[in-house]
A protein has these predicted regions:
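N-terminal metal-binding scaffold of metallo-dependent hydrolase/deaminase domains
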Residues: 1-33
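Catalytic metal-binding/acid-base residues of hydrolase active sites
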Residues: 8, 51, 113
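Active-site metal-binding motif and surrounding structural segment of the metallo-beta-lactamase
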Residues: 31-42
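Residue-level structural signal for beta-strand termini and adjacent loop
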Residues: 32-33, 46, 58
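Conserved, mostly hydrophobic/aromatic
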Residues: 38, 49, 104
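Histidine-centered catalytic micro-motifs
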Residues: 43-55
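Active-site gating loops and adjacent loop-to-helix segments of metal-dependent hydrolytic enzymes
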Residues: 55-91
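Active-site loop-helix segments enriched in His/Asp/Glu that coordinate
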Residues: 83-117
Length: 117
């Protein structure tokens, strides 16, 4: 696969016109050249601090204070987590992972307040 456009590369995301060569999902080359595309090519994102175990409460709490939303034991998040069964929790986590993948996040680091169960 060839990806052409402006490539943002290196730690400083230096813009370089050219193409990226990908074979079998592996980056093979970054080539500087005149690109026939206005696309922007950049490295995938890494979310270094997630709580996908709380995904069931992701859209909840508009208009609440932080304390009303997350304070244990009766903040809205904690109530929603207690009320949800395992299947609902897993489905919500799967949706969060799918969203991250679809929006360019290649990996994430998960923090679990309640353990891994």
């Amino acid at each position: 696969m060839l990806l052409e456009g402006t490539i943002l590369q290196g730690r400083s995301f230096e813009p370089v016109e050219g193409r990226v060569v990908v074979e079998n999902g592996e980056l093979m080359a970054v080539e500087e050249d005149v690109a026939r595309s206005d696309d922007i090519i950049l490295p995938a994102f890494v979310n270094a601090h997630t709580h996908i175990g709380d995904s069931i409460a992701k859209e909840a709490g508009e208009g609440l204070t932080l304390e009303e939303l997350v304070a244990p034991p009766d903040g809205l998040k904690h109530r929603l987590l207690r009320q949800a069964d395992r299947g609902e929790l897993v489905a919500a986590m799967e949706r969060s992972i799918e969203y991250m993948e679809a929006s360019g996040t290649a990996s994430f680091i998960e923090f679990r307040e309640g353990g891994v169960d």
